Amino acid sequence: MAYGLPRRNTVQTILKGSCYKVQEPWDLAELTKTWYTNLTNIRLPFLGEIVFGSPMNLLASQTKQECQFPSMQSMALEKEYEAKRLTKLKCQENVCKEIQASLREKKVGLRRPLQPK
């Protein structure tokens, strides 16, 4: 396994908080191989098809034609909710602009020092 400098640095940043110290690229390759072997020995169902150096073959699946469209009532509710959300966002933007404009109009200067007691 050949590890270039960018990949080595990336993995080193990931390993910073762990107990592993990676000095050389071949140490990193050995560590990666050990992790991979440990993962395959666990025999998780989704890792069963992974073999060293070979790509996974994905199976083609059929899409179902029996999909139901949402009802008119749910579509109307969603449209109403979205309209309210967009109106609320627009109001927030307007309030933000008003606050910024009012802050720009104020004269800002140094504070006067407090009177001694």
From Swiss-Prot:
InterPro entries: DUF4522
Protein name per the record: Uncharacterized protein C4orf36 homolog
Organism: Mus musculus (Mouse)
Lineage, highest ranks first: Eukaryota, Metazoa, Chordata, Craniata, Vertebrata
